[in-house]
Swiss-Prot record:
Family: Belongs to the glycosyltransferase 48 family.
Gene: CALS2
Protein name per Swiss-Prot or TrEMBL: Callose synthase 2
GO cellular component: 1,3-beta-D-glucan synthase complex; plasma membrane
Catalytic function, reaction form: [(1->3)-beta-D-glucosyl](n) + UDP-alpha-D-glucose = [(1->3)-beta-D-glucosyl](n+1) + UDP + H(+)
Amino acid sequence: MAQRKGPDPPPPQRRILRTQTAGNLGEAMLDSEVVPSSLVEIAPILRVANEVEASNPRVAYLCRFYAFEKAHRLDPTSSGRGVRQFKTALLQRLERENETTLAGRQKSDAREMQSFYQHYYKKYIQALQNAADKADRAQLTKAYQTAAVLFEVLKAVNQTEDVEVADEILEAHTKVEEKSQIYVPYNILPLDPDSQNQAIMRFPEIQATVSALRNTRGLPWPAGHKKKLDEDMLDWLQTMFGFQKDNVSNQREHLILLLANVHIRQFPRPEQQPRLDDRALTIVMKKLFKNYKKWCKYLGRKSSLWLPTIQQEVQQRKLLYMGLYLLIWGEAANLRFLPECLCYIYHHMAFELYGMLAGSVSPMTGEHVKPAYGGEDEAFLQKVVTPIYKTIAKEAKRSRGGKSKHSEWRNYDDLNEYFWSIRCFRLGWPMRADADFFCQTAEELRLDRSENKPKTGDRWMGKVNFVEIRSFWHIFRSFDRMWSFYILSLQAMIIIAWNGSGKLSGIFQGDVFLKVLSIFITAAILKLAQAVLDIALSWKSRHSMSFHVKLRFIFKAVAAAIWVVLMPLTYAYSWKTPSGFAETIKNWFGGHQNSSPSFFIIVILIYLSPNMLSTLLFAFPFIRRYLERSDYKIVMLMMWWSQPRLYIGRGMHESALSLFKYTMFWVVLLISKLAFSFYAEIKPLVKPTKDIMRVHISVYRWHEFFPHAKSNMGVVIALWSPVILVYFMDTQIWYAIVSTLVGGLNGAFRRLGEIRTLGMLRSRFQSLPEAFNACLVPNEKSETPKKKGIMATFTRKFDQVPSSKDKEAARFAQMWNKIISSFREEDLISDREMELLLVPYWADRDLDLIRWPPFLLASKIPIALDMAKDSNGKDRELTKRLSVDSYMTCAVRECYASFKNLINFLVVGEREGQVINEIFSRIDEHIEKETLIKDLNLSALPDLYGQFVRLIEYLMENREEDKDQIVIVLLNMLEVVTRDIMDEEVPSMLESTHNGTYVKYDVMTPLHQQRKYFSQLRFPVYSQTEAWKEKIKRLHLLLTVKESAMDVPSNLEARRRLTFFSNSLFMEMPDAPKIRNMLSFSVLTPYYSEDVLFSIFGLEKQNEDGVSILFYLQKIFPDEWTNFLERVKCGSEEELRAREELEEELRLWASYRGQTLTKTVRGMMYYRKALELQAFLDMAKDEELMKGYKALELTSEDASKSGTSLWAQCQALADMKFTFVVSCQQYSVQKRSGDQRAKDILRLMTTYPSLRVAYIDEVEQTHKESYKGADEKIYYSALVKAAPQTKSMDSSESVQTLDQVIYRIKLPGPAILGEGKPENQNHSIIFTRGEGLQTIDMNQDNYMEEAFKMRNLLQEFLVKHGGVRTPTILGLREHIFTGSVSSLAWFMSNQENSFVTIGQRVLASPLKVRFHYGHPDVFDRLFHLTRGGVCKASKVINLSEDIFAGFNSTLREGNVTHHEYIQVGKGRDVGLNQISMFEAKIANGNGEQTLSRDLYRLGHRFDFFRMLSCYFTTIGFYFSTMLTVLTVYVFLYGRLYLVLSGLEEGLSNQKAFRSNMPLQAALASQSFVQIGFLMALPMMMEIGLERGFHNALIDFVLMQLQLASVFFTFQLGTKTHYYGRTLFHGGAEYRGTGRGFVVFHAKFAENYRFYSRSHFVKGIELMILLLVYQIFGHAYRGVVTYILITVSIWFMVVTWLFAPFLFNPSGFEWQKIVDDWTDWNKWIYNRGGIGVPPEKSWESWWEKEIGHLRHSGKRGIILEIVLALRFFIFQYGLVYQLSTFKQENQSLWIYGASWFVILFILLIVKGLGVGRQRFSTNFQLLFRIIKGFVFLTFLGLLITFLALRFLTPKDIFLCMLAFMPTGWGMLLIAQACKPLIQRLGFWSSVRTLARGYEILMGLLLFTPVAFLAWFPFVSEFQTRMLFNQAFSRGLQISRILGGQRKDRSSKNKE
C-alpha cells in the first residue's frame, strides 16, 4: 500500500541521491511518472501507452518501444542518473510484452498503428468535436495531445517498415496539429478562439480586458514577424524583449484577472461598461508603480513612464507598461527579493519601450531604438537575470551554508541596497561585466590572477549600509534611546535616594537638583559610546558608504566627544565647593572662579535643542512624515543630522490618535515601573549600602588582594548587581500586566466572548438570521449604510425576525445548513444531531413563519401538550406560559400550520374537505378570540397527537399497502376532534356541511351506494420531492423528540466553532460586497516533505507501548470515531476493515486529525465552496433561491457543461476570485522516485480540481546536449493541475489519473540559495492571482463557517482604521487545535492562543507594532510583490523569515492590523522535545533579529514610545528572559564571594544586611518571570474573556496541578541558552520540529544530547553554587522571604535537571529505564569519526556540540574563555575553607598547592591513558599491575590523611566541589583553543576528560530517575499527569491487548 516507514518519513536527503535507481523501478515502470529527469521528454509517450493499453496492447507495446528508442537517442551513453536502470527495466518489460502482444496481432505493426490512429480519430476525437457546445474542452485538449503522440509513434513504425503514411491520416494529423496549438492546458482563463462559450469568458469584464490587451494597433513588429491569431501586447513584448513563452502566458492571465476584478468594482453593473475602464487601469498602475516612482524620486531620476498625448493611445501605453513590469517580475526568479534591483531593470527597459513606441533614433547607431538585450528566445533570462543571479549565488556560496560571518558575504539586503544609491547607475545598460556590483573579493582576485582568468572587476564592494556583526552591543545600538532613558533614570533615582531626605520631593532642593543634573554628563558619554559603536560596527561597509554618510559618522563622534569634555567642565563650575570628580576637574582648569549654575543649564539647553525639536515633531506626526519624504536641500540637511537618509523607514509615523493611545499606554507603564523601582528596590537599598560602606572589615577567610580597600565595594557590587539587573528586566513584567489589562478591555469592547456557551447561543438564536443577513449578505442599495465604530457595535440591535422574511430566511437557511453539513462531513456531529441542527432547505410558502432548527424546538410539543391538557380551561395562563418560551410558541404554531397543510394536501374528497375546513375555521376563530381552552376540551389532545404521529410515520414510509391504515387513522382523528375535543359544536357543524341530511338510516344500503369517508386520498405521494421529504421528517422530529436537545451538539469542537462563529456575527466587520465586486485573493502554502496523507501502514504501526496512531486517535476523539463509523455505515471497526473501498476514507479520517497537508487543503478549499454558495445567493432569482442551493448542486453535473447555467456562473466567479497554490518544492523529485507523497498530492489535485501545485523541476541535461559535461542541470518553476481522468476508449472506466503542466518557466539556476522556505514561496508566488494573498502553513486548517467571512475581511484593505494609511497586512486570529493531545500540548496551545489573540490584539492596537508572525495573515499582494515579497530569504540572518515580512512592510510605510471576527486553525508541537526545538528555533531567530538591519532601523526610525513597544514585543522579551537567568547567576556568585571571603560573617551583625527587602523584591520579580507569570497573565485574561473567569480560574489551578510552572521554568532555560549562544557564536539553524503525535518515549541518551548544554550543565552549576551557600552561609536561615527565594532557585535547578524525564511518556517505567541505560552506555563509549552520526556516538556528538566555536571568531572565543574563568572561583574560595588551612595565614601558596594537586592528578590520568595505548595490548598484565598500584597508593594516602585528621569527610566533599568546576573550566578553555591544543598533542586527553565529565553528569541525572522508577505509583502518576484520562485508559488497555496477542501467538507456536 504505502512505501513509507511509519507516519513520519525522513525527509529526502540532498536533492536526488539514489532515488531513481533499481530499488523502485522494475514493475513500477507501469507508472509513466517514474522517469529520470534527463528523459523527461518520453513521459508523454509512456502516458499514452498506459492510456491505450486496455483497448490495444500491441499499440501500447509499440509506444513503449518507441519511448525506449527515444530514450536511447536522448542519452546514448546512459550518463544521466538512474538512466541505465530505467532502460534495463523498460527493456525487460518490452521483451515480455512482445511475445504476448504478437500473438494477438492481426496485421503488421504499421497497419495496426494506422487503423488504431484512424479508429481513435473518428471514434473519439470527432465524437468529442461534434458534442453539443464542445463543453468538455479538457477531454478534447487531452485527446489532441494523445493523437499527436500516436502520430509520432505511427511515423516511426512506418519508417521502420518502409510503409507510406496514408493521406487520410496525414490530413487528420494536420487538423489535430492545428487544434493542439489552440487547445493547450490552461490555468483559469481559456484564451483560445473556441473558448467563448466557457462561463468565465462570458463575463463582460473579462471580455473588455481581453479586447483591450489585443489592441496592438501601431506597435512596431520586427521585420519577418509571422502574425498569429489573437495576438496581443504581451506577445509584442515577448518578441521585442525575449521573455519566455510560458512566462508571457502566465502574466497574461494574471493581468487580465487583475484588471477585470478592479474594473468590475468600478461598475457594479457590468453591462454599463463594455470597454475596459480607465479608472481600473489607473488604480492597478498606481499600486504597481508606487514603489518604482518613489525610487526614481529618491534617486532624483525622471521615471520612464511617459504617456502619449493622443488620448486613444494612453490605454495601450499603460497596459504595455504594466505588462512589461509583470513580465520582468514573473521571470526574475531570486531577483524578486531585490525590489529596487527590479526597479533598475524596469527603468531601463521601460525607457527602451518608450523609445521604440516614439520611434526615437539612437544617437550611437543612427538606427531606430532597439532593446539592449535583443528579442531572441530567453534573452531576458540569459542576459539580464542570470548575471545578477550568479552574483547572488556566488555570495550565498561564500556564506558556506551560514557558517561564515555575516560581514564576509553580501546577503539579499546588501545586494538590493546597492540600488538605493545613485551609484547604481554606474552598472550601466547594457550592464557592464566589470561593474563593482559584480566584482570579487581579494581572495577570488588572487585565484583568478593565478589562473590567468580575464579580469571581471576590481575589489569586492563589501557590505552595503549595514554590517551584521555578532555582538551584544547591537542591543544597545539599535535601542540606544531606551537604554539611555533607563540608565539616566536609574542615576537620577539613586541620586535622589542617596541625598537629602531620600524622598522624590527632595529633587527640588538646590543641591539635589544640581546633582541630578549630572545625568547630562552620563547622557553625553552614552552619546559618545553610540557614535563610537556606530563607527566600529559599520567599519566593514565603509567602501560602499557615500561621503556624506561617512562625514556624518565623523561629525557625530567629534560632537559627542566635545560634549563629553564640555559637560563635566561646566558642571564643575556650577558648584561653589565641588567634591569628588567635580573638584578634580575644577582644579585641572584653575578653579578659583566663581560658580555659575546658570551657565551649565544654558549648556544643557543647547545640548537638548535637537531633542526639543524632535519632541515638537513627535507631537505633530504629519509634519515629521512630510519632512522625511521631502527633497528640499535644507530639510534634507536637517534630517541628515538626526538620521542618515535612507530609502526605507521614512514617513512611518502614525496618526495623532494612534500616537496618543500608545503614548498613554507607555506613560502609565513607565510611571508604574519607575515608582516600583524607586520605592521597592532603590530607596530601601541606600541605607544598608551606607551602613556597609562605613563598616571596616579586617578578617578575611581567603587571600584578599585588596585588604585595605575602602567602603567594601565588593559587597556593594554583590548587593546592587541583581537589583540593577532586575531594574532593567522588570519592564517586561509591567508590560505583561498593562498589556493584559488593555487587551482584556479591548477584547470586551470588541464584544469577544458574548456568546460563550450553547445556552447563550440558544438565547440569541432568534437574532441570528438577521445578524447573518446583516454581516454575510450584501446590502441592497436602498438600505441605509451601517454605522461604524465601537459604540455602533454595542448599540446595534437585530430584529428578532427579519422583515423581508422569505428571502432572508432562505439565505440564512442555505448558509447555516452548509455549515452544519460541513460539521457532519468532518464527523463532529452524528446524523441525528445534524437533523436537529438543520434549518429546512426548502422555503415553504404556505407557512407564514420562520422555521427554527429542531434542536431549539425539541421536546417543546410534548411539553406544550401536557401544559394544555393540565390547563383546566384557563386560556390566559397557557398563553402567558407560551409567551415566556418563544421557541415553544414557534413549535406549536409550526406544527399546527403543518398539520393543516398536510391534511388539506392529503384529503381530496369534497365533503371531507368541507368538514375539515369547517373544523379549522372554528379553531382559528377560537384562537383569535382566545377562547380555545375555555370552549374546547383539550384533555383529549394526547389521543389526537398519537394518531398524528402514526399518520406521519405512514407518510415517511409512503407505501401503497398502508393506504387503508391511513384512512382509519384519519377517521380516528376526526372522531377525536368531533367527539372529544369539539363535542358541543359537532351536530351543528356536521349539519351545516351535510346540508341538513344528517339522518339515521334504518334500511341496509347496497355496497356500491355506501359512502366511504376519505376514499379519495393523495396517497402514496408519487411526486415526492426533497422538499416534501424534509418537511415530513422535520414534523416527525418536532413531534417525537421527547428529551431535551440541550447538549446538541455534544462535540466540544463543534460547540466551540458554533459559539465563536455566532459571536463573531455580533462583532464589527465591514459590509459584505457581492461576490462579483469583492477583492480577489489567493492562498499560498509552502510544503517540503511532511505528511500529506497517513498511510494505512503508518496508522497501524505500533510504538514500543503497542500504541498505533489510529488507536491513539480513536481514544482522543471517541465521538468523532463513532460518527465516522455511522457516516460510512459500519457497525464496528472490524466491519470497516472488511470493506476495502473504505480504506481511503479511514486514511482521510485520521489525516484530518493530524497535521497533514490534506487537512490544510480541505480547510482552504472551503473558501471556494463558500464563494460558490455566496455567488448563488447573489445571483439566484427568487424562484431559484426558494428551491435552494441543494437543488442546484443536484443538477451540477449537467449544468457545468453549459456556460450559461447558474451553476457554471457560480463556478466561474469562484475561479475568478480565488486561487489556491501549494508550493511543493520536491514534487518532481518525489514523483520521479515513485514516492507515496507525490501520489497523495496528485490525489488532492484530483479531489479538488481548482487546486494548483507549483514545484521546482530539476532536469538533468544529457551528455550529448550538454556543453559543460554531464552534470549540467536546468531548473524550472512549474505549475500543474490534475488532468482530466483518462478513460479507456471502449469503456467509461478511468485508466489513470495524471497531472498536466500548465506553465513551465526556466530559472537561472537552483532557486534555494537561502533559508529554503522563503524561496519556495518566492518561486511559486508568480502563479498566485488577485489583490490579497493569504500565506498558510501546511499545519493549518480552516472552517466552512469562517470562509463565509473572507469577503468581509478583504474589504478591510479599503479602510484606513483610524490611521493614515490602508492596511498592507491583515492579521488573523488563530485557534490552536493540538491542545487535547497532552498536558504539554495544552500548556503550549494556551500560551500560543494568548499570543495570537490578546497578544497580537494589543500589538496592533494601541501599540501599532504588530508584524507578521507565521502564517494566516493576508497580504496586500500588489504592495508586497513590488517590495520584495512576503518574506526575506538570506541564510541564517532571516531564520525567522516571517517576521521580516512585517518589518519590511512597516519600514516601507505599510500598516499591519489584527482582526478577531475570523479565525484559522493552527497545529502546534506536542512533545517536550518538539516544543523545545520550536522554542530554540524562535530564540535563534530572535538572536539573529538582534543583529539585523531591519530591527536597527525600526529602533531608530520609530518615535520613542513605539520603539519601546517594538523592543519589548520582539527581542526585548528574549533579552529580559536572559537577564532573569543572569540575575540568578549574579545573585549566587555575589553570595559565593561574600560567603567564601568571610565578608558575610563580618557583616552578619548588620540588621539591614540580614533582612534585605530590595533584594527580596528584585528576586521575587525574577521568580515571577521564571515560573511563567508573563505567560499566565494574558492567558488567564483571554480564557476569562472568552470562556468566563471561573473557567479561567479552574484552568489555572489545573495547569498548576499538571506542573505548568515546571514547564515554563524549563522553557526559560531553552530561550536563554539559544538566544545567548546565537548572539555570542552564531550557529542558528532551521530546526524541523516534526508534526507528529508524541506518544513515544524519548530515550535517556536523546534527552541528554538535546538538553545537556542548555539545561543540565547550567543546572549542575547552580546546584553547586547553592550547595556551597547552604554549607557556609549562616545569616539568613530564619527569614521567610529569603527561604522563598532559595526555594525558587532550587525549583529552577530541579526543573532544569529533571523536567525532560518528568514530561517524557513512560519516563518512570522500570523496563524503559533499563533499556535507556543500555542505550546510553553504548552511545557514550562508541568511537566517533567520519560518517558516524551524533546519535550513534558520544564523540561525534561532542565534536558537533563544540563546532560553533570554530566559526565564532576571535571575539566569541575570548568571550568563551572569560566566561569559563568563573569556574576557578570555586577552587580559590574553597581551598581556604579546608580544616587543615583554616588556622594558617591566608597565603597564596595554599592556592598554588591546590593547582599542583590538580596538575598531578591530570598527569597521572594522562600517563594511564598513554599506558593504555602503548602497553594494554602486549603488556596487559604489567599495565594492570601499574593501574592497581596507582589506585592503592591513592587509597592509602586518603586513609592516612583521614586518620591523621589532616582531612575530614567534609573536606573531601569540599575538594570535589572545588576541583569539579575547575576541571570543567579548563575543559571549556581547551575547547575554545582547540587548534592550539591539537598542535600541542593534548586533544585526545581533553576528549577523555570531557567523556569523564559526561559520564558523571549522566550518572547524576540517571540515579534519581532510576530510584523513582522502582515505585510503580510514580509511573502511574506521571501518565495521569501527562495525558488526558481517556488516553491513559487506552494506554493500559493497549498493553493488556499486546500481552494477550503475545500469549496467543506463543500458544499457536506450541
